[in-house]
Structures are given as C-alpha cells and as structure tokens.
From Swiss-Prot:
Catalyzes the base-exchange of a guanine (G) residue with the queuine precursor 7-aminomethyl-7-deazaguanine (PreQ1) at position 34 (anticodon wobble position) in tRNAs with GU(N) anticodons (tRNA-Asp, -Asn, -His and -Tyr). Catalysis occurs through a double-displacement mechanism. The nucleophile active site attacks the C1' of nucleotide 34 to detach the guanine base from the RNA, forming a covalent enzyme-RNA intermediate. The proton acceptor active site deprotonates the incoming PreQ1, allowing a nucleophilic attack on the C1' of the ribose to form the product. Binds 1 zinc ion per subunit. It is an enzyme of class 2 (transferase). Homodimer. Within each dimer, one monomer is responsible for RNA recognition and catalysis, while the other monomer binds to the replacement base PreQ1. One of its GO terms (molecular function) is tRNA-guanosine(34) queuine transglycosylase activity. This is Queuine tRNA-ribosyltransferase. It comes from Streptococcus gordonii (strain Challis / ATCC 35105 / BCRC 15272 / CH1 / DL1 / V288). Transmembrane segments: none annotated. Substrate binds at residues 96-100, 150, 193, 220. Gene3D superfamilies: Queuine tRNA-ribosyltransferase-like. Keywords: Glycosyltransferase, Metal-binding, Queuosine biosynthesis, Transferase, tRNA processing, Zinc. The active site is at residues 96, 270. Residues 251-257, 275-279 are annotated as: RNA binding. GO terms for cellular component: cytosol.
Amino acid sequence: MSDSPIQYRLIKKEKHTGARLGEIITPHGTFPTPMFMPVGTQATVKTQSPEELKQMGSGIILANTYHLWLRPGDELIARAGGLHKFMNWDQPILTDSGGFQVYSLADSRNITEEGVTFKNHLNGSKMFLSPEKAISIQNNLGSDIMMSFDECPQFYQPYDYVKKSIERTSRWAERGLKAHSRPHDQGLFGIVQGAGFEDLRRQSAQDLVSMDFPGYSIGGLAVGESHEEMNAVLDFTTPLLPENKPRYLMGVGAPDSLIDGVIRGVDMFDCVLPTRIARNGTCMTSEGRLVVKNAQFEEDFTPLDHNCDCYTCTNYTRAYIRHLLKADETFGLRLTSYHNLYFLVNLMKKVRQAIMDDNLLEFREDFMERYGYNRSNRNF
C-alpha cells in the first residue's frame, strides 16, 4: 500500500530503547510522533474549541464512530461535507470502529460471524453493526485514519475464547478492507488483539500484517490488566509490527503508560482520561495529581502547576478554579480540561525531545519520581 494516504516517516530511533521519533503524513496535514490524541467522542473534545486544541499543540484528534452513527448520523455528517467541515477541524482526525463501545456500552449484544446485534443505549432500539457497516460509517465521516471492526475480548477471558475471537477479528478485518470505498484518501488500520496470550498476539499480528494495512493498532489493553501486564504485552507485540508503519496503542492515557508505551515503540495514543478526571477537579501536574476542589486550595493563589505555561496556569489560580468548580460553573471545567490536555500533549513533546537527545530512560526516571508513582499514585 505504498500509495496509501497515510505515510509514516521515521526520523530517529532512541539509542537505549525501542522509542522512535517520526511523523505521520495524512490528507489533512502531518503530525509529529509519539503523539497523544485528545478524544472528541461526539465530534467535540469536551469543553474545548478547535482553536484551543490547536493552540495547545494537538496535531490530531479522535472521534467516535458508534456515537456519531447513533447521533446525529453518519449520513447527515456526509451531507455536511464530512466530519472535518461539520466540526470545523482542518487537521487530521482518527475514528475508531465502534467495536469497543458496542462491547462496553450496549446491552444484550449478540456476536456472530456476520457482526454484532445490540440495543441502542439512547432509545433501546435493536441495532446491527458489521465490519462492512463500520467501514461505511467511517467512509461517510471522512476521517483520515479509520479502524477495522474488531472484537475486544476482556483481558482475562479463557484462551479458547480469545483464540476464536482473534480469528474472527482477522476475518472481519479482511471484509473491512474489501468494503473500504475511499482507500485513496482514508487510511484503514488493522487492530491486533489476543489479550495477554503471546502466541495469540503473534497470530493476530501475522494475520493483519499479511493484509498490508497502512498502520496497526494494539487493542485490548487498558481494560483492567496491571501496568506490568500491559508492558509485557507491548514487549512481545510491537516487534511483530512493521517498522515503516504507524503503531497505535488504543485507550491509553496515564502518563506512565504513555512513556512506557513509547519506550516499547508505540507512536500514537488516545484516552478520555484527561478530560474525564478534569470534570471531577483532578489535575495532572509535574508533581503528581492535584484535586483542586479540596479545601486546602480555598486560599491558594498559585497556578495549578508551577512548571506549566498553559493558558490555565498562566492566567488563573487554584483558588479561583476551585471556586468555579464548587459553583458548578462551566468555565472551571474548561480550565481544568485545557490544562490536563495540554499536560499530556506537552509531555509527549518532552518525550520527543528526550528521544532526540537519547536520554528517554533518564527522563522517565525523573518524571516518575516527580509525579509520585512511587507513592501509590497508580491511576493517573
């Protein structure tokens, strides 16, 4: 697929790890990697405008196929001129396949070889999503990077179930490739599954690599397994993927997981974490997480993070942001969300510099110490 609309350019490998500095070229522009991608589930990153996302350095954002199919509908978005025009975002967009949401949100789902029947979580109506339909929806949305329809088995499901699941996912990937009507301007990624089983991850990767996708996603992680288990899966999975194509770790956004994913050769990450925890008043800072709603910040007239130069930290204090959140003012959610997104986008900028300087392991050690991962701060 050398004529693919998605191209990966390797700039530099880090001397001491599997990390790589590169860039991904898409029909709507080029972005540097490794990159964290903010999630815009409903064609908006919660509380943030496209201008703010550009200001903080988001080179690409993610939108959700399942949610946009249900509301407002992919055909309406196509009539609007596609997702880029609909949401006024002129940079790259990645869409997931809808598979994960079907398994995690939908009730009464029934998986067959043809696809998945499930109940619409908005109105209870019966819906059917197949590999072909997932591709058709994404073709209507017009994203730069699309995902194959896959089943995301739970990490601790039995071996026999996971084996059948990955074999079906490979067949679905092949069906999706055939159904893809816009290969000239949308790049379709295959998704490697296999839970924690090394041989099944290898089988899944080999199946998908043989289909020559323009890029590869690693799915089925950040679903309840330990950090060590995730790293172990990455250790044996990323080497199976082509060096000349992008590697995307789905649903991962905790700072330590981002750094450890990069060390193992991953280029792209996404997660709702920064905006989700921001709405509860939890902020990521260079010295660990800070719950700005707490009473101790009532008269704290300093920034959220003394080492951050984002819009929030440059202009507002902990006391003011705490007041906004306590008063249920939307502006408080905007400020905490902006800061958390900026924190992760900026973290990846620092990671890219550390790769350039060949000191990523030292950067990791320093970051982990400051952030407090040695103080039972596992989840953020």
